[in-house]
Structure formats: structure tokens, C-alpha cells
Amino acid sequence: MLHQNIETFIGCESSYADADIVLYGAPFDSTTSYRPGARFGPAAMRHESYGLETYSPYQDKDLTDIKVFDSGDMELCFGSSESALKDIEARAETILQDGKFPLLLGGEHLVTLGAVRAAARKYPAMHIIHFDAHAGLRQDYLGAELSHACVLRRCHDILGDGRIHQFCIRSGDREEFTFAKTHTEMHKFDFSGLEALAAELCRTQMPVYLTIDLDCLDPSCFPGTGTPEAGGVTFMQLLNAILTVSKTNIIGADVNELAPMLDASGVSTAMACKVLRELLLALNV
């Protein structure tokens, strides 16, 4: 049994037993390659959420109408990526075994790997839909294979070819883009192709894991992230993409790479909260 967090994300006050969705935070950023601070993301989102309404005029839904349990942040070993990933994997596995939907808050993008390990064990035919500025397909980064720069490559090690679908990608080295041509389905710069993919996944009812790196957003509206990349999408484009993916058989998700201290205005944290609210309300669980 997981215990109630003291400061929950707004509207997420269900008991664990009654909840359909379980939030769990992974405050980890030890492999950050540029600007650290993503470990403060989950707590900042919870605190900032109380400046947000529980009601979404975009979807005409309210967080008080759904059952979400916020289990707070995990205690993770900053000095060991594998140890942290094992803890995240164990938490995700518990939530899945209890028949609930796991929604992970990062933290840097490497934390996704722990959740994917657990989800793929329960759903071997799983696909990943990946929103990000960065390909994340390096074999290693400065010799480290467990890095946020390698997270989708490690996910590919688990799932194999043709089951990772990448959108908004606009940064990476030549080898990553070459790898993607034969091993993943990459859509550069925006969400072109997402509706067709979602329709096919709906038809086949394949399990889908959704991972959202918030740096898919343009830094003009979301500067508070470790590796900002010009040329990103808008909030409304991301919201419409989330609503499109919500029609598929989503079995797990994460939102990651908010580094709140890198945006003194607080706009990035407010944006992250709104993305999370809309994702929670879009899930059909």
C-alpha cells in the first residue's frame, strides 16, 4: 500500500484503494548533460498547481470528477542511475499489479526507462509514443549508456524495431537520425502523422505508453528546462496531441524535464501543471 502525499497535485485526493490513476514523482537528474534542476520538477508542480483551477474548459472536465492518488516523490539514490531506475521500476510494477494507471513525474527523461521496464513486462506488445525535442537515441553519452541522452535507445533495446513513435524531434547527432530511419518511426519538428498512428493503434488496440518531455514545447513559452531547443510546438498543439493519443489504449505515461529554477518567472512550472491537468483529464481509465 502506498501512502498519501502531504501536498498533492490539486484535485488528486482519492485514496489509493479507490484511485484509478496514481501519480508518483521521480526527483532525479544525475545524468543531466547541460543544465540540472529537473529533480525539483515534481514538487514544484504540486506547489504551483494550487494556482490552477481543477476545471478544464478545453475538455469540460474537472479533476474532482476523477479518482487520482498522489503518492508523492520517491527517495532515489542520486549517485546510481541503475539503483534509481530499479526503484522506479518497482513502484510502477506495484501500481500496475494493483490494476491502476501509473503516471510518473520527472525528473530528467532517464526516469522513463524504469517505468517502461515495468510496463513492457506486463504488456510485451507495447508501443511508445514519444514527444520530445531530442531523439534520445544515442548508444552512450560520454561512455554512459544510462543517460537521459540514451533513454529511447534503451527503450528500443526492450521493445525492438517499429514500436517507438517519436514526434517533435529537432535535435540529436547524425547517428541518432540515421538509427531512427530503420529502427523507430520519427516525425521531425511537429505532430505530423500522429492522427494516422493513433487511428491504427486504436484499430489494433495495442497497449501504448506515452512519454512527454516538456522541451517539445518552444522555449519562448517553456524556458525552464535543462536543454531548451528553439523551434518547438505550442501549448495548444501539445494539448491536441494529448487528446489524439488519449483515444488509444494508454497503459502508462510520464511528464518530465521541468527544471523550475531555470525560469524565475514561474511560467514554465505553470505550463507543466496545465499539461499535467489536461493529461489526467484526457485519460480514459
What is the meaning of each model-derived region?
Residues L2-V285:
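Conserved alpha-helical scaffold segments that buttress catalytic/binding sites
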